[in-house]
């Protein structure tokens, strides 16, 4: 087992009522053993308490693949099966391609109202793993499939990695007025780390960097046609156009990314106004990736996924809800109202309802 070539897929953990997933990506030159790491926490009280196996197989011409929504179990249709599919266990295949995700939702008018015929995000990940030998190939498989058959989910951030490269692919549909999806994929530099946690993280991207950036041809023109963007092409921000920030997206989602970065690099204090939810549109945008001050071990990454904002302005062990024992955990729901006043709990990376 060559650990320096192994893509380490850590914990797969999803939540129902609140933003609920966290991914941390580590480039191969940012890790101690030369591996790309992906973490995947999903907090759903057991909704995802199983690991699926898709055996490798050869398929005769004319074989059809049934598409069933991975969340609702609703049949969506059929697509032609690939001539050969690879062995997949959970979120990683025999070629060490791994795909995980967090749902950012985005603009509701772009969500599918009647998704019959499209491909949902769970099926899309499985198809990418069954049909690709590299991360780049998986991104092409996934984006080609939604272009041809449609996309049947809300906005998603996908982590797509192999032993050599780690990418973030962000995608959202076009609503009922058009088939397909708009998307952008950015490669994380080998010596950097990145993360996403239920909010779109790709803002501006280099339109000319074909080696490290991929995007739908109409990602900017579609945004213009919907009135989401009016500037120059090089000013375009995927996140601003398709998932505008609000208090929840910053305090409950981007703050988790901030806290992960804060474990491994310096200078994150200046992004507190970006993630505290009080300075929407007026604070400096947190970068998509940062360079860590040290090489990360598997144990370092596992420890970071146990984060409760300790020793930060959002520390859950020190607020009024922590009780006499300084507990970081809170009962659901995330937000509530009492006597006409709204309250909320912090949403850390580590939470008691993690499924696996």
Q: In which residue ranges do the predicted regions lie?
A:
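A short catalytic or substrate-binding loop motif that flags glycine-/basic-rich loops and adjacent residues
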Residues: 17-18, 151-152, 347-353
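Positively charged n-region of N-terminal signal peptides that target proteins for export
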Residues: 2-6
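Short, charged, surface-exposed loops that flank catalytic or proteolytic processing sites
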Residues: 131-137
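Short, well-ordered beta-strand elements within core beta-sheets of diverse protein domains
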Residues: 125-131
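Hydrophobic h-region of N-terminal signal peptides that target proteins for export
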Residues: 10-19
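Mid-to-C-terminal functional-domain signal that highlights helix-capping/loop sites
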Residues: 288, 292, 298, 302-308, ...
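Substrate-recognition/cap regions that form aromatic- and gly/pro-loop-enriched pockets
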Residues: 323-356
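A contiguous strand-loop segment
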Residues: 21-121, 141-296
């Amino acid at each position: 087992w060559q650990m320096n070539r192994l893509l380490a897929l850590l914990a797969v953990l999803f939540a129902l009522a609140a933003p609920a997933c966290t991914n941390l990506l580590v480039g191969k030159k940012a890790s101690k053993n030369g591996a790309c790491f992906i973490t995947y926490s999903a907090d759903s009280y057991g909704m995802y308490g199983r690991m699926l196996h898709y055996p490798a197989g050869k398929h005769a011409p004319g074989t059809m693949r049934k598409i069933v929504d991975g969340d609702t179990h609703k049949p969506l249709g059929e697509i032609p099966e690939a001539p050969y599919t690879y062995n997949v266990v959970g979120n990683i295949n025999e070629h060490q391609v791994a795909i995980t995700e967090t749902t950012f939702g985005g603009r509701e008018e772009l969500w599918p109202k009647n998704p019959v015929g499209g491909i949902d995000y769970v099926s899309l990940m499985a198809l990418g793993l069954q049909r690709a030998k590299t991360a780049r190939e998986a991104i092409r498989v996934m984006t080609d499939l939604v272009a041809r058959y449609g996309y049947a989910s809300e906005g998603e951030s996908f982590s797509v990695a192999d032993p050599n490269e780690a990418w973030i692919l962000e995608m959202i549909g076009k609503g009922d007025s058009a088939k397909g999806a708009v998307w952008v994929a950015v490669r994380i530099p080998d010596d950097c780390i990145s993360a996403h946690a239920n909010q779109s993280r790709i803002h501006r991207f280099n339109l000319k960097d074909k080696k490290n950036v991929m995007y739908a041809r109409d990602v900017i023109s579609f945004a213009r046609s919907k009135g989401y963007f009016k500037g120059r092409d090089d000013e375009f921000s995927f996140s601003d156009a398709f998932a505008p920030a609000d208090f929840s997206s910053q305090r409950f989602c981007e703050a988790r990314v901030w806290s992960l970065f804060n474990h491994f690099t310096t200078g994150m204090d200046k992004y507190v106004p970006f993630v505290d939810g009080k300075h929407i549109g007026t604070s400096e945008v947190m970068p998509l990736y940062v360079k860590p001050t040290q090489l990360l071990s598997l144990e370092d990454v596992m420890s970071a996924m146990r984060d409760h904002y300790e020793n930060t302005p959002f520390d859950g062990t020190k607020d009024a809800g922590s009780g006499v024992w300084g507990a970081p955990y809170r009962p659901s729901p995330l937000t509530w109202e009492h006597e006409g006043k709204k309250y909320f709990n912090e949403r850390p990376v580590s939470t008691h309802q993690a499924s696996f």
